[in-house]
């Protein structure tokens, strides 16, 4: 019939959709389909798919647990329901129906879910015109969709469908077995339970069956029956034996065409067999009850028997109907077709779409019927299966555990001279076997080798594969002394070196990206022996025996050097250590514990015992050569050295980081050969199982693997077992590899031997190089003929051993995949699946015409080496991109203190620069070791602006453009015109814009430039703005918001245009000083607008006035230049606008406290406070003189800037640079941002290059980030090491002759500690060690450990010179605590009176040791002869582990007083104090006194001397004038520790005095610092309360006796009362050069005071800590270090002088030559660490009579510093 769509609204489109779930697997390649679904489940877009697979697996595990043991044992362990595809035999066994049902429902629903997750916009199952159909298990899958409101619901419902499919299969198997039993473990293909007869009618078949059944007397359960029929065929079912008999004996059936169906699980569609009880057994479960309570049927499903939708109101009813259908009803697909046609006629849709997995016979029949019955109707089918094979290139892992792992860096030291990966490849490609006789630096092979095996402890083989000179090491680079380097295992040292090289090649820069955050990087190294510790360093156990020899310190040392916070693991699994380590690193990356992993393996052979032991265990080959893998005479392996490091990341992180991806790990796993005949014997079955596991998890077909790198040790058993497992999995005979899928195998041990702990990663490195070179190198292990146990049919399996070099090129659309296999002698097996890295296409272009290229090193020798390597690279790669070169050398490399950098625009410039560097490298000086220089921003005035600018950055730098557009939008929002036309080059350069536009454009450009510099890490510590430039400066300093800045600039420009006449005034630049102009002006009128330098002055006035003065000055020989400006700033021309402008600024702008010091050209001083800059200031700055010269001089005088300051000029052209250089003539560096007539990037790159060479830490990654997609990381040469050979030779033959007994020593138990009396137990008074009370007298001794956490935190809360210092407030708390304790002891029932902590005198400061693991104790003794005297005496001493306490370093008294008397005595003084406070307020308002915010005050304090922690920072604001100040104080409410009077309370109210003495410009703090040795009294009449608000006031006055000593009284006020006072607080001034000496920690808790022998030192020291020089006692033993160091004969120091002897002693202890001790050498870089410092200090005392502190090398960090000090005091 013709189909006519229903009439409705014109243009209405109505679609009917039918989704069909088949009863056949939708793919012939079921394993391939499962792999693809598994891979998709790892994608972030397919989290529902992943959840469905997880839930389905859990459901089946629950069902399996309920099976009888006989059935349960048939099932293998499974990680996923998809695992069952790997066991095709199970689909023909007793549970075949369950397995098929599980697999079919899983793949159908997984495919369905995944498709609509991929194309979510096509998921439309809400429509009323949606129907479902299915056959068999497909009906259950359809039910999952019917019951789900959303796609996510299908994961939940679907898992129950899979459960039901499994239960259905179990039921059918149980019932069918009663009809025809079978063996549980059936073999071969079982008989079918169903046959199909095509081209026959149901009636004919049924008639014949009726005849047969009536005549034979067959029981009802044994009858053959029709289970399905259609117009084209009939299916009959029954017990297999009866079916076979039927088709053998019946003429009707025998003579017809028929075929059996793969129905092996039993009978279905048999209403004579199954009952409702069976249905309920399948459906009625607890999970189903829960499901039915949550979901309802929503979409109708056609019944295959009736053709009508299942009549179900609940989920349970729906499933019962479906299970009943499957078990009892005949399939009648024609009814489904008719049902669909009926619905089409009812709905009259415009389109009928059938969604299928793939086209099948039922769908053919359906579509044929639709097209026949409904003419002119659009009917379509849509297949969803093709989606599964689609592999998205942009796949994003769903979570870290689904990520691939990229290898992005590699480095090695391997036998055969393979000191890098290229040389290693040469060994492989040339097919070299690099074995040799054991070299003499390991042990004497002549004495330690016995081929007969009769001598004790001797090796049976003299051969191995060895690294050349494994002792080579650049010790200073890694901050190790030669002595420590010599005692450190070369495995550890080479791990450090190769880790650095691998990271360098990986482009690692700390914290460059999230994945390179140092907190998220871990190290993982495999190591299985400690030869060097056991043999070499054990000959003379010394300081570094443990740290240098124990294997845990290897990866730990890498973490420590690079400051990685992630885990560090040393892993030992014998021969598989390094590949197991790779798996451990992958696991860490997969579980999210780390983001980057440095991974490797190490093995350096020096112990003859291991050779002997392996010989006795029959592991080693006696035949010359490396491992003879697969050779007929293979008799064991050949030992080998090796050190390899790799860098690994998750693939998505590596791609985001723009790394070079060398290879990608798809999977890694380890198992154990538990069923092997012995622990060391391999097991093919376990290895094959591991291969299958790792391939399945990786989602890789074994036939897609084209190379397997075998363990291949060269043993008869091992080679056979491994090859068997490889052939079984990768090249089986049953499913053979196609001709275009050859499999190659190889073993690197044939080239470089068996590296044991490093073997696995050596094999991995080989495969990485093969991928890189696209070549499979020849296998050289077969020296004679192949091992006869190896299968003879390798060619038949398409498996090949490459006897010659083979090509291994990439195939478009298909990745090369390899497997690396590794065994452990302890029974473990580890395998890794490796894929070639993705090809990264560059996108975009780098528009920058100039590029910074740099080379750096830690030593001059290495700098020269790096330069030579770099030049050689350029010669070899003449066409290299400068963009890539800059990106690699700047953003992807470490930058050391020896730096060379230049901005170049072409290869020729680069070559010239390299030549210049080569000529000058010997005279190169490193950057300062004290840290990067401070940076100052100078903002240019309007004179630098063009009329119309074309700022290239606006077009080429996205961040700059965005900033400018944002600022322009802000300006327009305030009613100003857009200023973009003035900077975008849209107008000619001479086009004059309005002043509003011009000035806004300049300010906007300056703000954007400043923000850009700051984004590059060039952040100012001070700013200055010249005239108009001061607006941008104030914004960067935090005073003005961007909006207010533009508002003030724009409104002032508007006022100028409205009230002033352009051109009526003029400005004149004169090359003369103000005084010179005044002298010769001769009464001519002018105003001084700007004083820019000593002889750089700008005048302003009317045009005539300026003409007159100019002519006069020029006649006197002074150069004059008229400035082209529309208005003459800082002149009378602005007078008409000033009042209005001030009003506008008052109302329209908010002025914030500065977060940076501001050098004010208006005031000629530096602004720190939040009161100075206001509307009046803006008025004055517009009108009054710009005294740039005076402002800079003031800033220099008060040390806001100094000679090291790097100046960056912010503006379109450098103007201020000249002013700065003329005023601050010794300034080292000034650079511009832009320069008129020069391309922007040329200027910026030159400036960046200069800043970089000056030591500024530029964020180079941020510089390159906008263009990174167009940039590639180059594989440049690695660092050129300044290597020396550090090696302790094993001497003699004691390893052979040693006995078999061991000596042991017992440590005597320390004497029991007497029970100590109880005490206050506060943070400062921790325990009472002695006390005696006799009547009214008392003596108490307490001891405290400065390393106790609360006390140590308190000390580090008052940090000086980077050290934690016990502040005087801590001593005060000790005094108050002990005073309270003693008084209560003697007067237990009496309230403790107020206490005056008086007469505090600190002779020597107490500085916290850096080593917090050892106690640092001090002792305080308090005595009184009579408590009624109301006086206590206190003395402080240092206490050490051995020996008596030191002489007192501090003393004080406690007076018990009446607080009310104090209050009365202070009352007359109150008005005087308040009067001074008010006077200071007035001075601050007038701009005479300085007002500081609390934050600024403490920043200044920290920059000068003391860096306070937050709890100590009580001062909220300070007003200071010269030596007088007051502060508003709020005490912290943060609690930490147990105190009597918290030190941070005392400090907060009292340290205003210290602030004055170290910050006030009345004292030269640039050259001096001031500390307090104590006070006369400290009294608090009221307790200091957390959160309390106080005011402190003090005026410091120099003493008459000594002008370096100052005294003052600190008054503490609260609520207009004096409640406390620190009377007579004393400060002494010291030269700043003594700061290091006074404030450095003693590095040993056993330190004793050095008395009388130290150089001159202050006689009084700070309570806030001046350190004592200390000597240390330590015992050292020196390993054999070869020749003693030689004294440099050319040294200008007398060789017999103390200085020369001291340097010789340093060289000896450190194990270096005196010639290494150049004046600029830094001891820390030479490896003189804290431990060695203690040893050297003791040697100085013993051998030279020079007593020094353990911190000597902190005070004198360079050789030159130490030499100068020694010459000064000991010449």
Swiss-Prot record:
Known catalytic reactions: holo-[ACP] + 8 malonyl-CoA + 8 H(+) = atrochrysone carboxyl-[ACP] + 8 CO2 + 8 CoA + 2 H2O
Keywords (A to Z) from UniProt: Multifunctional enzyme, Phosphopantetheine, Phosphoprotein, Transferase
Pathway membership, UniProt: Secondary metabolite biosynthesis
Gene Ontology annotations of biological process type: fatty acid biosynthetic process; secondary metabolite biosynthetic process
Enzyme class: transferase
Region of interest (C-terminal hotdog fold), ranges: 1488-1636
EC number: 2.3.1.-
Domain Ketosynthase family 3 (KS3) positions: 402-836
Region (N-terminal acylcarrier protein transacylase domain (SAT)): 38-269
Span list, region N-terminal hotdog fold: 1326-1461
Domain PKS/mFAS DH: 1326-1636
Cited Pfam families: Acyl_transf_1, CurL-like_PKS_C, ketoacyl-synt, Ketoacyl-synt_C, PP-binding, SAT
Superkingdom of the source species: Eukaryota
InterPro entries in the cross-refs: Ac_transferase_dom_sf, ACP-like_sf, Acyl_transferase_dom, Acyl_Trfase/lysoPLipase, Ketoacyl_synth_AS, Ketoacyl_synth_C, Ketoacyl_synth_N, Malonyl_transacylase_ACP-bd
Record text about domains: Multidomain protein; including a starter unit:ACP transacylase (SAT) that selects the starter unit; a ketosynthase (KS) that catalyzes repeated decarboxylative condensation to elongate the polyketide backbone; a malonyl-CoA:ACP transacylase (MAT) that selects and transfers the extender unit malonyl-CoA; a product template (PT) domain that controls the immediate cyclization regioselectivity of the reactive polyketide backbone; and an acyl-carrier protein (ACP) that serves as the tether of the growing and completed polyketide via its phosphopantetheinyl arm.
Protein name (database record): Atrochrysone carboxylic acid synthase
The organism of origin for this protein: Aspergillus terreus (strain NIH 2624 / FGSC A1156)
Gene symbol of the encoding locus: gedC
């Amino acid at each position: 019939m013709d189909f006519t769509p229903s009439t409705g609204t014109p243009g209405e489109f109505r679609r009917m959709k039918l989704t069909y779930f088949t009863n056949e697997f939708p793919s012939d390649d079921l394993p391939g389909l499962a792999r693809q679904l598994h891979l998709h489940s790892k994608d972030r877009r397919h989290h529902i798919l992943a959840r469905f697979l997880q839930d389905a697996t859990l459901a089946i595990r629950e069902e399996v647990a309920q099976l009888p043991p006989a059935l349960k044992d048939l099932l293998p362990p499974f990680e996923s329901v998809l695992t069952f595809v790997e066991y095709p035999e199970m689909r023909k066994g007793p549970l075949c129906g369950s397995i098929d049902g599980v697999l079919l429902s899983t793949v159908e629903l997984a495919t369905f879910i995944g498709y609509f997750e991929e194309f979510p916009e096509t998921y439309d199952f809400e429509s009323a015109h949606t129907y479902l159909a299915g056959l068999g298990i497909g009906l259950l899958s359809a039910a999952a969709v019917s019951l789900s409101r959303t796609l996510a619901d299908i994961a939940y419902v679907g898992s129950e469908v899979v459960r039901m499919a499994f239960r259905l299969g179990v039921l059918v198997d149980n019932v069918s077995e009663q009809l025809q039993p079978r063996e549980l473990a059936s073999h071969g293909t079982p008989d079918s339970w169903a046959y199909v007869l095509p081209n026959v009618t149901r009636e004919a078949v049924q008639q014949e069956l009726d005849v047969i059944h009536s005549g034979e007397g067959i029981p009802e359960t044994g009858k053959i029956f029709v289970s399905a029929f259609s117009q084209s065929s009939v299916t009959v079912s029954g017990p297999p034996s009866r079916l076979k008999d039927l088709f053998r004996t019946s003429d009707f059936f025998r003579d017809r065409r028929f075929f059996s169906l793969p129905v092996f699980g039993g009978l279905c569609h048999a209403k004579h067999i199954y009952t409702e009880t069976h249905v309920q057994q399948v459906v009625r479960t607890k999970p189903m009850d829960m499901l039915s309570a949550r979901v309802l049927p929503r979409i109708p499903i056609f019944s295959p028997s009736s053709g009508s939708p299942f009549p179900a109101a609940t989920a349970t009813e729906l499933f019962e109907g479906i299970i009943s259908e499957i078990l009892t009803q005949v399939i009648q697909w024609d009814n489904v077709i008719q049902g669909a046609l009926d619905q089409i006629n009812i709905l009259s849709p415009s389109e009928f779409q059938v969604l299928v997995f793939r086209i099948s016979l039922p769908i053919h029949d359906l579509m044929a019927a639709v097209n026949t019955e409904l003419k002119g109707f659009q009917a379509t089918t849509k297949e969803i299966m093709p989606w599964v094979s689609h592999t998205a290139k942009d796949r994003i892992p769903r979570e870290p555990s689904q990520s691939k792992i990229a290898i992005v860096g590699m480095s090695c030291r391997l036998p055969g001279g393979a000191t890098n990966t290229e040389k290693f490849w040469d060994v492989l490609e040339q097919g070299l076997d690099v074995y040799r006789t054991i070299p003499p630096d390991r042990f004497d092979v002549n004495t330690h080798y016995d081929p007969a095996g009769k001598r004790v402890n001797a090796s049976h083989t003299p051969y191995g594969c060895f690294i050349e000179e494994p002792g080579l090491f650049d010790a200073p680079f890694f901050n190790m002394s030669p002595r420590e380097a010599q005692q450190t295992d070369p495995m550890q040292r080479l791990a450090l070196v190769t880790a650095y090289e691998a990271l360098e090649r990986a482009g690692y820069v700390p914290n460059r990206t999230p994945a390179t955050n140092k907190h998220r990087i871990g190290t993982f190294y495999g190591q299985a022996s400690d030869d060097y510790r056991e043999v070499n360093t054990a000959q003379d156990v010394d300081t570094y025996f443990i740290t240098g020899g124990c294997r845990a310190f290897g990866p730990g040392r890498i973490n420590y050097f690079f400051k990685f916070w992630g885990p560090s693991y040393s892993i030992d699994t014998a021969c598989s250590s390094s590949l197991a380590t790779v798996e451990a690193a992958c696991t860490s990356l997969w579980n999210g514990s780390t983001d980057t992993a440095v991974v490797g393996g190490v093995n350096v052979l020096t112990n003859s015992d291991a050779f002997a032991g392996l010989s006795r265990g029959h592991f080693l080959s006696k035949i010359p050569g490396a491992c003879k893998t697969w050779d007929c005479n293979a008799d064991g392996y050949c030992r080998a050295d090796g050190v390899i490091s790799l860098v690994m990341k998750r693939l998505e992180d590596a791609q985001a980081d723009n790394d070079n991806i060398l290879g990608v790990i798809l999977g890694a796993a380890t198992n154990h050969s538990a069923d092997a005949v012995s622990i060391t014997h391999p097991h093919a079955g376990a290895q094959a199982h591991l291969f299958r596991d790792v391939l399945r998890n990786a989602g890789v077909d074994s036939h897609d693997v084209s190379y397997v790198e075998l363990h291949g040790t060269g043993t008869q058993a091992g080679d056979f077992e491994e090859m068997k497992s490889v052939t079984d999995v990768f090249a089986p005979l049953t499913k053979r590899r196609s001709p275009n899928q050859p499999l190659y195998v190889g073993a690197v041990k044939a080239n470089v031997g068996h590296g044991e702990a490093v073997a696995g990663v050596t094999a991995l490195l080989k495969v990485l190089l093969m991928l890189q070179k696209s070549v499979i190198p020849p296998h050289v292990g077969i020296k004679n003929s192949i091992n006869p146990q190896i299968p003879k049919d390798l060619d038949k399996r398409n498996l090949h051993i490459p006897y010659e070099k083979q090509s291994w090129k990439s195939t478009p659309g298909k990745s090369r995949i390899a497997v690396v296999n590794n065994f452990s002698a302890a029974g473990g097996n580890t395998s890794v699946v490796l894929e070639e890295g993705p090809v990264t296409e560059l996108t975009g272009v780098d528009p920058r015409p100039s590029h910074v290229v740099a080379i750096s090193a830690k030593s001059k020798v290495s700098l020269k080496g790096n330069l030579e390597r770099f030049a050689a690279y350029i010669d070899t790669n003449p066409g290299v991109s400068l963009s890539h070169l800059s990106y690699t050398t700047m953003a992807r490399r470490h930058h050391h203190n020896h730096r060379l950098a230049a901005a170049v625009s072409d290869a020729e410039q680069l070559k010239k620069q390299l030549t210049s560097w080569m000529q000058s490298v010997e005279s190169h000086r490193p950057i300062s070791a004290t840290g990067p220089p401070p940076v100052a921003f100078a903002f240019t005035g309007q004179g630098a602006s063009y009329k119309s600018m074309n700022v290239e950055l606006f077009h080429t730098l996205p961040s700059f453009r965005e900033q400018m557009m944002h600022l322009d939008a802000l300006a327009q929002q305030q009613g100003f015109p857009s200023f973009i036309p003035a900077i975008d080059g849209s107008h000619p350069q001479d086009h004059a814009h309005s002043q509003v536009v011009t000035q806004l454009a300049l300010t906007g450009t300056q703000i954007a430039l400043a923000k850009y510099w700051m984004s590059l890490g060039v952040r100012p510590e001070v700013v200055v703005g010249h005239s108009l430039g001061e607006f941008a400066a104030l914004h960067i300093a935090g005073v003005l918001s961007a909006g207010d800045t533009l508002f003030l600039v724009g409104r002032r420009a508007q006022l100028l245009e409205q009230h002033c006449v352009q051109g009526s005034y003029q400005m004149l630049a004169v090359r003369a000083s103000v005084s010179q102009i005044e002298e010769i002006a001769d009464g001519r009128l002018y105003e001084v607008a700007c004083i820019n330098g000593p002889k750089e002055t700008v005048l302003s006035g009317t045009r005539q006035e300026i003409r007159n003065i100019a002519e006069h000055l020029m006649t006197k020989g002074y150069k004059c230049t008229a400035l082209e400006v529309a208005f003459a700033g800082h002149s009378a021309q602005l007078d008409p606008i000033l009042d209005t402008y001030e009003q506008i600024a008052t109302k329209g702008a908010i002025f914030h406290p500065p977060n940076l010091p501001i050098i004010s050209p208006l005031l000629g001083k530096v602004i720190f406070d939040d009161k100075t800059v206001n509307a009046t200031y803006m008025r004055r700055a517009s009108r009054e003189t710009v005294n740039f010269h005076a402002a800079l001089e003031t800033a220099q005088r008060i040390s806001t800037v100094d000679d090291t300051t790097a100046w960056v000029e912010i503006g379109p052209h450098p103007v201020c640079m000249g002013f700065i250089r003329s005023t601050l003539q010794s300034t080292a560096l000034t650079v511009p941002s832009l320069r008129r007539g020069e391309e922007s990037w040329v200027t910026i790159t030159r400036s960046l290059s200069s800043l970089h060479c000056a030591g500024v830490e530029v964020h180079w990654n941020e510089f390159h980030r906008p263009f990174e997609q167009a940039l590639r990381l180059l594989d440049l040469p690695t660092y050129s090491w300044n290597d020396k050979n550090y090696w302790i030779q094993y001497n003699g033959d004691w390893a052979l002759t040693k006995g078999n007994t061991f000596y042991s020593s017992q440590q005597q138990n320390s004497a029991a500690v007497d029970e100590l009396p109880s005490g206050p137990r506060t943070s400062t008074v921790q325990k009472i060690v002695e006390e005696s009370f006799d009547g009214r007298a008392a003596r108490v001794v307490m001891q405290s450990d400065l390393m106790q956490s609360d006390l140590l935190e308190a000390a580090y809360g008052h940090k000086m010179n980077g050290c934690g210092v016990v502040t005087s407030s801590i001593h005060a708390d000790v005094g108050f605590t002990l005073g309270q304790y003693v008084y209560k002891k003697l007067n237990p029932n009496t309230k403790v009176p107020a206490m005056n902590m008086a007469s505090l005198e600190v002779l020597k400061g107490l500085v916290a040791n850096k080593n917090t693991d050892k106690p640092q104790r001090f002792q305080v003794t308090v005595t009184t002869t009579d408590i009624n005297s109301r006086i206590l005496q206190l003395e402080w001493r240092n206490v050490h582990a051995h020996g008596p306490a030191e002489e007192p370093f501090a003393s004080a008294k406690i007076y018990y007083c009446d607080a009310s008397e104090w209050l009365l005595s202070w009352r007359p003084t109150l008005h005087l104090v308040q009067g001074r406070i008010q006077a200071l307020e007035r001075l601050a308002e007038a701009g005479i006194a300085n007002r500081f915010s609390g934050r600024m005050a403490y920043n200044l304090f920290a920059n000068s001397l003391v860096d306070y922690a937050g709890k100590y920072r009580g001062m909220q604001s300070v007003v200071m004038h010269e030596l007088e100040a007051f502060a508003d104080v709020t005490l912290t409410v943060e609690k930490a520790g147990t105190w009597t009077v918290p030190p941070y309370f005392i400090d907060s109210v009292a340290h205003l005095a210290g602030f004055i003495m170290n910050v006030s410009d009345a004292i030269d703090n640039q050259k001096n610092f001031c500390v307090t040795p104590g006070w006369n009294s400290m009294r608090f009449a009221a307790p200091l309360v957390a959160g309390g608000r106080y005011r402190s006031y003090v005026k410091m006055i120099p003493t008459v006796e000594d002008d370096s000593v100052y005294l003052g009284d600190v008054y503490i006020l609260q609520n207009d009362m004096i409640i406390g006072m620190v009377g007579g607080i004393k400060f002494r001034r010291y030269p700043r050069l003594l700061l290091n000496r006074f404030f450095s920690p003693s590095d040993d808790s056993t330190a004793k005071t050095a008395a009388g022998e130290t150089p001159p030192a202050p006689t009084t020291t700070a309570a806030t800590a001046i350190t004592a020089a200390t000597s240390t006692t330590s015992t050292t033993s020196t390993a054999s270090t070869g020749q003693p160091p030689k004294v440099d004969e050319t040294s200008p120091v007398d060789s017999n002088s103390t200085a020369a002897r001291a340097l010789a002693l340093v060289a000896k202890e450190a194990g270096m030559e005196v010639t290494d001790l150049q004046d600029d050498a830094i001891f820390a870089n030479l490896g003189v660490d804290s431990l060695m410092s203690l040893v050297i200090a003791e040697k100085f005392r013993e051998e030279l009579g020079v007593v020094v502190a353990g911190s000597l090398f902190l005070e004198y960090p360079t050789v030159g510093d130490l030499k100068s000090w020694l010459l000064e005091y000991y010449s």
